[in-house]
């Protein structure tokens, strides 16, 4: 029976799908770095960066990467569920799916608000006409990204690490790294914007572990891969 369950847990999708987490990490890191370098992290900034064409282009490039980032993350979630296989628990699976989908939703909402601000205020001078509108949109985008989005990322890390410990589908050290990173995101993300990079770095580690364990399983038991 144990051998049969092991066979069913072997990933059935193409192996290339497992790199979706690596793709997400690369895109999300690039997007975060671009927007952090171009726009101030302070939600009360006066919007001087809007008058610089180069900085505006950096922000637009960052925003254009986000849709692909979200798509890659959805595939990463599917890879994780496939890796868990029959060991998936309904209780934790509900939190896993909910936090992951809310993370993507909050990410897209933050980008939509930011893009709306850039379209409404083509330069720093236009902010002088309606400064309250700019500050409202800027604060909303900051809250969506740095409060709600990252808190959902922290919950996703907690529940994935918990599943990893309970089912042994992830190594113990990787689960503890997830708990540590999630706690940091949950407590101090609003004060240190660069800490948001912890989430894509953790996803990168998990993706590398899944790829390594998959290839290692194939090399030690090539027949099981053909059966799956």
Show the residue positions of the predicted features:
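Hydrophobic, aromatic-enriched alpha-helical segments typical of multi-pass transmembrane helices
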Residues: 2-228
């Amino acid at each position: 029976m144990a051998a049969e369950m092991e066979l069913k847990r072997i990933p059935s999708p193409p192996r290339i799908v497992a790199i979706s987490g690596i793709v997400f990490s690369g895109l999300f890191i690039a997007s975060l770095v671009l927007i952090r370098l171009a726009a101030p992290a302070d939600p009360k900034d006066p919007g001087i960066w809007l008058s610089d064409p180069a900085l505006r282009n950096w922000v637009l490039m960052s925003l254009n990467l986000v849709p692909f980032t979200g798509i890659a993350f959805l595939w990463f979630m599917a890879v994780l569920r496939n890796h868990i296989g029959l060991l998936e628990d309904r209780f934790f699976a509900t939190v896993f799916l909910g936090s992951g989908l809310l993370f993507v939703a909050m990410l897209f909402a933050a980008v939509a608000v930011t893009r709306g601000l850039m379209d409404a205020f083509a330069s720093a001078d236009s902010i002088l006409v309606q400064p309250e509108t700019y500050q409202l949109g800027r604060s909303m985008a900051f809250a969506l990204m740095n409060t709600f989005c990252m808190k959902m990322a922290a919950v996703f890390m907690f529940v994935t690490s918990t599943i990893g410990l309970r089912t042994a589908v992830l190594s113990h050290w990787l689960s503890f790294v997830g708990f540590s990173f999630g706690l940091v995101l949950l407590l101090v993300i609003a004060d240190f914007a660069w800490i948001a990079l912890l989430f894509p770095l953790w996803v990168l580690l998990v993706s590398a572990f899944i790829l390594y364990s998959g290839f290692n399983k194939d090399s030690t038991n090539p027949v099981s891969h053909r059966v799956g």
